[in-house]
Regions:
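Short secondary-structure boundary segments
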Residues: 220, 243, 264-265
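Short, structured secondary-structure boundary patches
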Residues: 219, 237-241, 281-286
Length: 286
């Protein structure tokens, strides 16, 4: 992850998660480790998948104690298998025990998203279609989840509401129609801002093309209607398919010739990748 992003955004989010988990005291750790004791603990994969979030994992321990260190056997984007040794954390035993759950929560979540994204992106090989995520992210986790999508081989759609214009059904209703919504967006937003509009039928697509939308999203349209829409657009706008996308239908959608396929499932439905910290070893011989 970008070091500036890590410092300005990610550190605060990790600290918030640590405060949520530790609050006043880790009573379990304080009971068995009342004083500082050097130790190591091993990071082990318990399932097959793609690793993502190693820097966030390491940073969690560093924020608790700058003297903590992590040595990894893999890098973000690498494939791991059940039983693989992924890395070792070294530091005060109290820090290793207290930071374990938060660090693993980030790593498991990000690795799960990267794994699912990798599986979906693999189905698009040989096509021009780019797999993108959505804003359907866990509150407070967007920066991590979108980073995981990229590590898994996908791309990011707009990061937040200020990044691009995305006119959905309620925006169109509020504006009074497709053409009016696009015209109002052009008048308000910077000339550098991309204007995308969601269309549910061919009439909406035709109107969006005529007014000059940059990207036209086909929202839950039939396969035949999307094929007709792409022919109608004829390269005058980028095209995006969204809605009910899964591993079973993503290739057929890409074969239509759409530029982008967006899937909220990348972030809201990906299962975690099972990882564990095991075999804590005290180094002071006591």
């Amino acid at each position: 992850m970008n070091p500036i992003t890590m410092k300005l955004v990610v550190d605060d989010l990790i600290l918030q998660a640590l405060r949520e988990d530790i609050t006043f005291e880790d009573v379990s750790t304080a009971s068995v480790c009342p004083t500082a004791r050097p130790a190591t603990v091993e990071l082990i994969a318990k399932a097959d998948g793609i690793i993502a979030g190693l820097d966030v994992f390491a940073r969690t321990f560093e924020l608790l104690d700058p003297q903590s260190s992590v040595l990894f056997d893999v890098a973000d984007g690498d494939e791991v298998h059940a039983g693989d040794h992924v890395g070792q954390v070294r530091g005060d035993a109290r820090v290793l025990l207290s930071g374990e759950r938060v660090a693993l929560n980030y790593l498991q979540r990000m690795s799960g998203i990267a794994t699912y994204t990798h599986q979906m992106a693999a189905a698009l090989e040989g096509t021009k279609t780019v797999l993108v995520d959505t804003r359907k992210t866990t509150p407070g986790m967007r920066v991590f989840e979108k980073a995981a999508v990229e590590i898994g081989g996908g791309s990011n759609h707009r990061y937040n509401l200020s990044t691009a214009v995305m006119l959905k059904d309620n925006h169109i209703d509020a504006a009074g129609g497709v053409a009016r919504a696009i015209e109002m967006a052009r008048a308000h937003a910077s000339f550098t801002t991309t204007v995308e509009i969601e269309c549910e039928n061919l009439d909406m697509v035709r109107e969006a093309v005529e007014v000059g939308a940059d990207i036209i999203m086909f929202d839950n349209m039939t396969h035949d209607d999307m094929a007709a829409a792409i022919e109608l657009i004829d390269g005058r706008a980028k095209t995006e398919c969204s809605g009910n996308v899964d591993a079973d239908n993503i290739r057929a959608l890409a074969d239509l010739g759409v530029d982008f396929i967006s899937s909220g499932a990348l972030t809201h439905s990906a299962p975690i990748l099972d990882l564990s910290l095991k075999h804590l070893r005290l180094l002071d011989g006591k």
